[in-house]
Structure formats: C-alpha cells, structure tokens
C-alpha cells in the first residue's frame, strides 16, 4: 500500500470512502503537488488532507460528495428488512444490480455547531464525509421507529431555523429529472438509516406515534459520532396554494410547511419519474393521510412555485434531498449522475421550472404558520386529491432513461398504489389538467433549458395571480418576449438556402442588369482628352460611357476590324467620338513639364535660406545652346558632341561675380532635336529660369515654340538669348517680331520679357545675360532648407560597365550626403559615391547642386523624384508601393511599338500578313532610350510594325545577342559599346548589330529596314507603239505587218491592241519576225511581223502598245 511511507491518492480516497477528485481538490487547497489519482503523497500530507476534510470550520468551503461502493450483503440485508420500510413508504423494489450504482451521500454538520443569524447570510460550512460502513454499523434496522424519526425531525427543524441560505445562486443550471441517470445508486441503506435520512433531508414524518426514547438515543449516537446522515433521496415539497394567499399579499414570509421539513410543491405529481435520481424511491409516503399530525417545523418554509422546479440545487433546506448539488464553487464530478432533462442531457419535462433565487428562500423561511393554516392545508389537500385523481395518469408506462443508464422503476400514481385514506397531491386541478393535456407541446417549448428558461412564466413556476405579484422585481427573472420566436423564425428563413435559379430566370436577370447598365451609361461626357494619340477600344468605350461592342460595331461599319485591346490612332478616335457627339481634345505635351511636387514643406519654413537658381537652356537644334554654355563655362563641350548636337541633359554649376559677390548658377543643357521632347520637358520641370536661345539668322522654329510651351507649363520666367548676332543676315528685330506673336514681348518694346542679343562664338554680352538671369532669379526669391533629408529629381541615368547604375541628381531641397538611403521612383539606392561635373568626389551636395551618384540597385527612370529616408526599411517600403506602377510603366515602354493601328490591321487583312521588324534597343542613358522610342512611334506603321523586344540603357551583352538570335531581331546600339564576348557571339549567331552615335542616322536606317520588308510593287513599263499596216493569213492564224512608231517591240512582251480608242485584246506577243527571221526585238523605224496565238482578227489601222511589268521598291507611306 505504501512505498517509502508514500500513500497514493486512490488509496487515500478508498480509505475515506471519497472520490479521487475530492482528494485532489483538498490537495490543491493545501498546495500539495499531485497530478492524478495515481500520484503518491507522504503520510504527513495525507494526514493534512484528512484533517482538512474532517475540519468543521465554517469559513472553509470544501464540498465532497461521496460515492461509496455498496456491498452485496448489505443490499441483501436491506432487501430482507424492506418490509418494515414499506409500511411507511410506498415504493417499488429495485431490480437492478446494486453494485454498479453506489449510494451518494451528502454529509451534514452537527446542528449544534451552526450559529448563523438568518438576517446576516454567511457562507455555509461544507459538511465532512464519514464512512458509510460505520454508519450502517451503528444504524440498525431494529431501531427504526417513528420516535427516532420525530426526534431527528425536531433536530432538523432546529438546524433549519439557524440556517441561512448562501447568497450565491447555483452555477449549474437546474436539472430536469426524466430518466434514471448514469451511476445512480439503488442500494437501500439500513431501514433506520434510511428513515433518518428521510426525516433529516426531506423532513418527512414516518409514523403518527413516534418513540421519543429511541429517537433521543439514536440522535445522541449520531451526534456524538459526528456522522451526518447519508442522503438517499429528496422528498417532494408541496404546498397548499389556497391557504397562504392572505399572508402573501402583505409579506414575503412563508412559515408553515405542509409537514415538518417539507416544501409544498404542487404540480410535482405529474413528473414522469422521480426515481431517476438518488433518494427518489421513498417519495410516496403516508404523510398525506387524514390522520397524520402536521408538526410545525419552523426551519422548513412553505415554498409555492417549486412544483415545476427540476432541481433544488444550491438552496438551504434542500441540500439533503438531492445528491448532485452544484453550489457555487463546487465542481461537478464526472462520476455524478447526469440527470436527464437538464440543458445538457435532454428536453425538459412539463411541469419543471427554473431555480428560485436564494434571497427568495431566505424571505420564505423566516416565520411559521399557525395550526389553523395547517388544518386548512390538509382540507385542501383532500379536495385537490379527489379532483386531480381523475385527470392525472401514471407516467410509469413511458419511462425515460438517460444514455448508458439502467432503468429504475417509476413512481406510480394509480389508485391501487395509494393507501386507504391517503390524501392526493396538493395541486391546482385545472393547471394539472392543462399540463397533462398535451405534454409534448410543453416539452417542445422548454426543450433547451439553458436558453429558454426565461420563458417560464409565473403560472408554470407555481405562482399565479396575486402570489406572483408579491415577488420583488429584482428576484424574479423577466419574461421572454413573445416576439423572440417570430424573430428566430425570420432569422432561420434568412439563412435558408436559396433555390437555384432557372436558366430563364438567369437570362431575365442578366437582361435587366444589362439594361440598367446601359441606362446608366446614357450620360455622355462633354468631351474626352486623348493622351499621346493612343487609346484602346476599351479605354475609348469607358471614356465615352459606352459598351466596347458599340465601338467595335461602329468601326466595322467603317470597314475596320478591331478588338477591345486594339490601339486606335487620333484620327480614328475623333471619327468614332464625333459619331456619338463627343468632341476630342488632344492631351497637350506641356503637361509633362508641369511641376507636380512641391519640394518645400511646411516644416521647412523656419530654416529657409537662399539657394542658387537652376537655369535650363532650351531652343531649336543648331541654334547654339551648347555653344552658349561653353562660353559661360569657358569649356568646349559642343565640339565633343557627336554630330555637333546635344543628345543628353548636361548639368553644370558656374560661379559668377556679381556686385563684388560670387554667385552660383546651375545650368541644364537640353537637346534641341525633336526626338528629345521628353528631355526638354524634364529639364523645364525642375528649372527656375528658362533661357530660350533663338538664332538671329533662323528665327522661331518648331522646337522653339515647343520650348515656350514647356516654360509656360512649368510657370517659370523666360529669358530670351538671341544668338548668332555676329553672322551675316542676322536680324534680332525679326526674332523679336516673331516672338511677340507668341506673346513674348521684349522690354524695349513695352513688354516684360528680357531679351539679350549675344554671340556665343565671340562671347558678346555673356555677362549681361548672366546679370539678367540673376535679376530674374532674385525676383523669384528662391529658397531651400539645407538642414533636412534631401529631395530632388533624377535628371539623367545610365548604366556604366565599371560603376554600375549611375544617376545625375539635382538636389532641390535639403542636403544629400554619402551613405544616405534614398528611393528614386521604384528604385532603391544607397549613395556610395558622388562626383561633380568635373569628376571630383564630394561628400555632400546642397540645394541646387547637380551630382552624379553611384549605388542604385538598378538604373532609375529619368524624371523621377528622389527622396532620402532615415533608414533602409522605410525606403524599401516606399519602393515596394511604387513597384507595381513602375512595372506597368516599364512594360508600356517596352510594348509601345507593339500597338497595332487600325489601318495597319486592315493592310494585314488585305495583304494576308503583317510585316514586323523586331528590334533590341540599347542606349547610353535612359533619356536616349525614351527619345528613340518616341521617334519610332512617329514612323509610318500601316504596313510594317516595329516591335521593340527590349529597351534599356547599358552596353550590349551576350544575353542580348542570344535574345536577338532567338527572335530574329536587329540590335540597335546608341552611343554604347559591346561587352566582352558579345561581338564573337554576334558573329557566331549571325546577328545584325548596328551602332549609332547620331539619332538622325539611326532613324533613317530603321525606316529603310522597314521598307526592305515590304514586297515590291509591279509597275507597268511602256516599251513602244506600232501601227498595223497589213495582215497576212498563215494557216489557222494571221500575222500583222507593223511599223514601229516609237520605242521597240520585244518578243514575249505584253501587248495591248487598241481599235477606235478601245482595247480589244490584251495578251502576250508570241511571234516577232523581220524578213522571215525570228528576232528578239525590233526598234523604231523598222517593219516587222507580229503574231499572237490567241488573237488573229487584225485590221489595218490597229494600234499595238507593247509593255512589260517591272518591280519597284516600295516606301513607307503615312496612313
């Protein structure tokens, strides 16, 4: 049993006749570490647990419910002595094996130890547990008599008078008893013990002639041993509902029970079975017989409304009449019987009701009723018994058993089982008849006790009329609203699965949706703006608020086949839009030059200082922009440009002494070629002052006007530099006149535009131009905050084979330092090094300072704004947000040339196949890539489509060669070189690699390549003309004698016979002879014979025209 003075939990529980869970709970209260019933504890710890269980301190709350095993011999002994018990208690014998159902007991402390004032509720001391075998040894069947019962009843009444119910309501919901629960005991204790328990727990009087001596001796024996009586069953508490109306109108106190310790519970007679729980087999007693005395037991209150209560758990006065007590804080053991009818076990039987508040019981226990009231109650019991005898049927024919439980015999209410003269159950006959009329409906209403117990009304709880109105509003639960059932039904209907719609219903619904969508799109916009001459059919339909099918149908009637993803040119868009009455406006190119980001923020206003101005030099090609900058910088940049034209944005900073102070100016040189429109717009976007260079001998040209529009879009002041005034034929006044037509009026003409005539070659008026620029910039009041993280714009970017991605950055606000983490568009970078325009390394760059920065993850897009962030995590998050848009933009650039126009699609339909020229474009900088792609868009593409498979800055690599070989593409390199191994790979794969330095030549060669893909045209070429002067018949045919008037005739050439200015025959010249000899051709002034196999009806005077078809190279034509 013990190992090294260790005791296991299950051994200790067996010794104490307790459940393992009780021992574990006691060990937990004593902080003894145990895990399960097989855990071992020391003898000292076991003694502590025993002392705690046997302790009678009322402050401790230890509730132990004992489930002792019942021996067979005890059961047999009880069975033999059962005859004495049957004389006072009517019950059916148990027929099941009693060994599997141990008797459940609930101990009780000695009544003398309880000194609790009823007005001050306190927690009830949890009774201790004693061994059932000891109780059985002391309580023998010989001492079972009525006197003992009466004496125990008197002790019980004393105990009840001092007992104050606990304030806490039961934690477990009431349990409805329908069938026998699992593990319910069937053992019958010794008759004396059983009778004592009936008297102490239920307060029932067994005999009309109690034996006082026997009662005293037995009570003394029990009290001395401190062995509380075992709980075998809970009696039925009944009331006389018609006897207490007068007192309940004025007081909550209910003092007179029907019998000592018995609660009056009308309506309990209709319960299907009360034997499904311990102690219910002694329910039918002879206490209602007419001769039974009604002793006044002050501790037991008369409790109306308890008739429907399934369980009296957690209330004083009822803890001895039940086993599965669930007081607040007491755990429910798995071995305890699960009563059917609880919210966990089954539907609630009719007549059961929710628990009554302990406060209500406290008020009901305070006073006793008089003897007169008792007599009235007994009389009413007789009347009710006679009335309800006819209407109440025995429920034993319909047994209810819980799962996995054995059947117990049900209590019968038949007339045969009643003793002569015994009064019937005290209840309202009408209410009983109503409940038994349709019990199934009643069960359905309260089938889930946990949810619907609030729906039990005052009638079902045993209170009716004025009795119910006496209860305090704080004690009674509110009624469940009648609308809850309808609401729940509506909710169920809402969650019901919808029927699957039929094909006809689906078609009808879709037709209605299409009609509604069409009506919603009837509102046409006032106008639409077409960006960059390109819109797909779907985009145009969205702008016009139309279905795409309407656009396709309109184009089809115009002889054009299109799809929803087809690109439309501006002319087609205007045609379609005018058909629907919507004008079209082309998106102005100047929008690219608008300043979209304000570099100065509100927190910078306190730390602003003056910054150098940024000046952008713009103008038409070959008007001397770079030469003017060379004169200012005193350098020779223009001579180094390929072809003498600028193809990059150059950023320079110049120091100029003005008013004995050195001033810094930042210049941006932009290309003047028409292909570099995006570069000019980008330069204008970041500028503070625009210098417009116009050649005095050439005047305003298209790019001059474009530069003016860029400057106006950027809202920057314009300074006009009239260059080349030293050349012959220069006319500055003519330039001023042309500019005045564009609303640029010179100051000497009364306008506000500064115009300075200069000569870049001879450096005339250069200082005056710089002074005017400084003057204009001072008016603009240019400021920045150097004490913040840098912000600015990417001017240019390219891929250097040694340095990696390199970007030209213009700092517009803040200070850029080495090591800063920045995000430029969707590109993340960390500055590894910075150099100025002279190639010198610098550590930081302030506002208006252009630098070349290294350290980007990839080549950034020119024109993107950059910003420095405090850490890489923040910058990476910003870059991630922009990644999607950047990928879409890059894809649009790569696929720009794939957009097929409608006219070229029509040509494809006519010719049978659309010619395509695949290109791979590599350039030195991102700006050059943009310029070339823009120029390719301007090429005629109605017959040959140019597809740019790859466009990126950087050198030509072997990967590019492999791509070109796989796709049959031509590689175009602009101002770039071939990587090591690329030339060898190109020769091996027979890939055509073209390198260019000037954009003119590049565009010309691409156009020639596109024309080379076109099939040549067959053109009719005239050979000569001859006149028929004689005819000769030869066999079946005829020969015409002709004279060559012009040109010549050739054998096998084509000829046309014209008679009276009408062509009567067209065919081949099959035979040509001169003087009977066959010849190949006959020239002008000679005579010859002409024969045709398919024509012989020659007439003198016919004209013969000889011609042949030759191929001619086709050229690209605009749409």
Curated annotation (Swiss-Prot):
Keywords: Cytoplasm, GTP-binding, Initiation factor, Nucleotide-binding, Protein biosynthesis. Residues 669-672 are annotated as: G3. It comes from the Bacteria. The keyword Protein biosynthesis applies. Residues 610-782 form the tr-type G domain. Residues 723-726 are annotated as: G4. Residues 116-153, 182-212, 242-257, 281-297, 319-328, 375-387 have a biased composition (Polar residues). GTP binds at residues 619-626, 669-673, 723-726. One of the essential components for the initiation of protein synthesis. Protects formylmethionyl-tRNA from spontaneous hydrolysis and promotes its binding to the 30S ribosomal subunits. Also involved in the hydrolysis of GTP during the formation of the 70S ribosomal complex. This is Translation initiation factor IF-2. It comes from Prochlorococcus marinus (strain MIT 9215). The gene is infB.
């Amino acid at each position: 049993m013990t190992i090294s003075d260790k005791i296991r939990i299950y051994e200790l529980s067996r010794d104490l006749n307790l459940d393992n869970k009780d021992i574990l709970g006691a060990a937990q209260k004593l902080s003894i570490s145990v895990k399960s019933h097989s855990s071992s504890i020391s003898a000292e710890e076991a003694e502590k647990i025993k002392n705690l269980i046997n302790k009678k301190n009322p402050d401790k709350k230890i509730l132990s419910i004992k489930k002792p095993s019942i021996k067979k011999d005890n059961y047999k002994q009880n069975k033999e002595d059962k005859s004495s018990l049957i004389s006072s208690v009517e019950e059916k014998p148990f027929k099941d094996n009693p060994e599997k159902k141990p008797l459940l007991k609930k101990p009780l402390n000695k009544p003398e130890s309880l000194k609790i004032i009823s007005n001050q509720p306190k927690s009830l001391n949890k009774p201790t547990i004693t061994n059932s075998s000891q109780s059985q040894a002391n309580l023998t069947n010989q001492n079972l008599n009525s006197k003992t019962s009466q004496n125990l009843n008197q002790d019980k009444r004393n105990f009840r008078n001092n007992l104050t119910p606990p304030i806490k309501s039961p934690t477990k919901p009431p349990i409805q008893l329908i069938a026998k629960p699992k593990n319910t005991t069937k053992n019958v204790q010794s008759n004396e013990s059983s009778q004592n328990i009936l008297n102490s727990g239920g307060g029932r009087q067994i005999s009309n002639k109690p034996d006082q001596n026997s009662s005293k001796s037995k009570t003394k024996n029990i009290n001395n041993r401190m062995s509380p009586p075992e709980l075998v069953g809970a009696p039925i508490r009944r009331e006389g509902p018609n006897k207490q109306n007068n007192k309940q109108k004025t007081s909550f106190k209910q003092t007179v029970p029907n019998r000592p310790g018995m609660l009056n519970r009308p309506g309990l007679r209709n319960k299907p079975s009360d034997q499904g729980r311990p102690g219910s087999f002694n329910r039918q007693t002879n206490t209602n017989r007419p001769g039974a005395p009604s002793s006044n037991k002050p501790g037991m209150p008369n409790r109306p409304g308890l008739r429907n209560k399934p369980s009296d758990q957690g209330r004083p006065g009822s803890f001895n009449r039940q086993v599965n007590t669930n007081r607040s804080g007491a755990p429910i053991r798995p071995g305890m019987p699960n009563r059917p009818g609880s919210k966990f076990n089954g539907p609630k039987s009719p007549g059961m009701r929710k628990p009554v508040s302990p406060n209500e019981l406290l008020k009901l226990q305070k006073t006793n009723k008089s003897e007169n009231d008792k007599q009235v109650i007994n009389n009413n019991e007789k009347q009710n018994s006679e009335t309800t005898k006819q209407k109440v049927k025995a429920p034993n024919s319909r047994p209810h058993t819980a799962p996995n439980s054995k059947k117990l015999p049900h209590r019968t209410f038949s007339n045969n089982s009643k003793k002569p003269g015994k009064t019937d159950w005290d209840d309202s006959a009408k209410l009983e008849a109503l409940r038994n009329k349709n019990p199934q409906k009643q069960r359905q209403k309260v089938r889930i006790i946990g949810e619907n117990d609030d729906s039990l009304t005052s009638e079902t709880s045993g209170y009716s009329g004025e009795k119910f109105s006496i209860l305090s509003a704080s004690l009674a639960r509110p009624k469940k609203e009648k609308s809850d059932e309808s609401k729940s039904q509506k909710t169920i209907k809402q969650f019901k699965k919808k029927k699957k719609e039929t094909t006809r219903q689906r078609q009808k619904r879709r037709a209605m949706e299409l009609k509604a969508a069409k009506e919603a799109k009837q509102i046409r916009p006032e106008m639409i703006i077409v960006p960059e001459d390109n819109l797909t059919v779907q985009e145009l339909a969205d702008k016009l608020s139309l279905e795409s099918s309407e656009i396709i149908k309109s184009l089809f009637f115009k002889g054009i086949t299109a799809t929803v993803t087809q690109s439309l040119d501006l002319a087609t868009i205007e045609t379609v839009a005018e058909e629907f009455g919507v004008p079209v406006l082309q998106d102005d190119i100047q929008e690219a030059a608008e300043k979209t980001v304000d570099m100065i923020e509100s927190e910078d206003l306190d730390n602003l200082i003056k910054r150098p101005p940024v000046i952008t030099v713009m103008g038409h090609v070959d008007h001397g922009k770079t030469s003017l900058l060379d004169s200012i910088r005193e350098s020779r940049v223009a001579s180094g440009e390929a072809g003498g034209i600028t193809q990059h944005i150059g950023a320079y900073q110049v120091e100029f002494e003005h008013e004995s102070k050195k001033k810094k100016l930042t210049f941006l040189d932009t290309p003047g070629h028409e292909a570099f429109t995006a570069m000019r717009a980008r330069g204008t976007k970041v500028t503070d002052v625009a210098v417009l260079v116009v050649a005095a001998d050439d005047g305003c040209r298209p790019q001059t006007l474009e530069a003016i529009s860029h400057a106006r879009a950027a809202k920057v002041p314009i300074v006009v530099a009239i260059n080349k005034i030293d050349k012959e034929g220069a006319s500055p006044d003519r330039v001023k006149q042309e500019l005045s037509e564009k609303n640029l009026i010179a100051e000497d003409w009364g306008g506000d535009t500064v115009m300075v005539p200069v000569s870049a070659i001879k450096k005339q008026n250069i200082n005056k131009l710089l002074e005017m620029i400084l003057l204009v910039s001072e008016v603009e009041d240019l400021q920045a905050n150097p004490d913040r993280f840098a912000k600015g714009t990417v001017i240019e970017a390219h891929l250097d084979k040694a340095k990696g991605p390199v970007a030209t950055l213009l700092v517009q606000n803040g200070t850029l330092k080495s090591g800063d983490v920045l995000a430029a568009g969707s590109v993340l970078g960390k500055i590894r090094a910075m150099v100025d325009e002279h190639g010198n390394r610098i550590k930081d760059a302030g506002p208006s300072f252009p630098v070349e920065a290294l350290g980007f993850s990839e080549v950034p897009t020119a024109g993107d704004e950059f910003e420095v962030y405090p850490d890489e995590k923040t910058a990476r998050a910003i870059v991630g947000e922009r990644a999607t848009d950047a990928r879409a933009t890059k894809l649009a650039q790569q696929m720009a040339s794939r957009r097929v126009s409608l006219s070229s699609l029509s040509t494809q339909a006519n010719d049978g196949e659309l010619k395509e020229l695949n290109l791979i474009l590599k350039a030195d900088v991102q700006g050059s890539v943009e310029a070339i792609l823009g120029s390719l868009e301007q090429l005629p593409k109605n017959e040959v489509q140019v597809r740019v498979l790859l466009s990126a800055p950087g050198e030509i690599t072997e990967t590019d060669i492999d791509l070109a070989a796989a796709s049959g593409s031509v590689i175009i390199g602009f101002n770039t070189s071939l990587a090591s191994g690329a030339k060898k790979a190109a020769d091996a794969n027979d890939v055509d690699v073209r390198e260019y330095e000037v954009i003119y030549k590049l565009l010309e060669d691409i156009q020639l390549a596109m024309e080379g893909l076109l099939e040549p045209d067959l053109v009719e070429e005239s050979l000569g003309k001859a006149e028929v002067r004689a005819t000769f018949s030869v066999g079946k045919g005829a020969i015409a004698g002709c004279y060559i008037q012009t040109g010549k005739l050739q054998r096998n050439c084509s000829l046309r016979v014209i008679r009276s200015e009408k062509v009567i025959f067209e065919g081949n010249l099959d035979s040509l002879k001169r003087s009977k000899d066959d010849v190949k051709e006959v020239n002008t002034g000679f005579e010859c014979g002409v024969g045709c196999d398919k024509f012989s009806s020659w007439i003198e005077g016919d004209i013969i025209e000889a011609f042949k078809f030759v191929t001619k190279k086709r050229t690209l034509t605009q749409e």
